[in-house]
């Protein structure tokens, strides 16, 4: 495995983060993830950024809206952050989503769904579905075009995004960035990269335990019939244990006659799209996603 200099710089930064003073393992992992924010680069200015809280009957969900200009009825991408279902926030993905809004020219709405293990499956997925439905029903208030909508997410967020796409009918496309699509962790890439970098087999088993409350097979977020899924863009990384399951999912979608665009980034690692401040390919991937979104949504 050839580690490129910029990837090594990112790994060095990650290895320098110290959270040993936090005794609670779960909290330490969450704080650790927040401390990786600088890898995304500087915080770009966006025309408007607004935080809102959606009040459902039984819970509140926060969203962050990135608006690239003051035009009305812009297309929209609803984004679900990664973090293994148990960490991540509006802040961990703020910088890449600012970049995506500026490069794509569409509204990006980031969803702060509830996290496992406090809220195991299906709470997080239901939050994502319900929030997307709320966005659709409040399109005029939000200044978006609900008929030009995509969902997107990275890692566990990609899992949630495709779960939403399978439940709702008016999603034009989905962008899945190294999505976790198989809880068995049995593909060759899990053997090849069991010790990482970034994501290990042990960590993956733990996150699926968190997400499912120990009932791993219960967390089926995918329909058996994929024929109704929207056009799909999947990004994978060569040195990523999730690589093969994402590629298998792409193949299943194609067999269901879904249009799939797929890019494998050579010598990249899990999470590289969040590391665009250090790794050039991370920023390039965001630009490529922006181009895809514009092509699919901007009429």
Segments (PLM) and residue ranges:
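Short amphipathic alpha-helix adjacent to the substrate-entry channel of hydrolases
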Residues: 91-110
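Gly/Ser-rich "nucleophile elbow"/oxyanion-hole loop immediately N-terminal to the catalytic nucleophile
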Residues: 136-151
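A glycine/proline-hinged amphipathic helix-loop "lid/cap" segment
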Residues: 1-65, 298-299
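Catalytic active-site module of serine/aspartate enzymes centered on a nucleophile-bearing elbow/loop
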Residues: 279-299
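Short beta-strand/loop motif that positions the catalytic acidic residue
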Residues: 234-236
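Gly/Ala-rich beta-loop-alpha elbow adjacent to hydrolase catalytic centers
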Residues: 153, 157, 161
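Hydrolase active-site cap/lid region
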Residues: 166-214
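Short beta-strand element of the alpha/beta-hydrolase
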Residues: 73-83
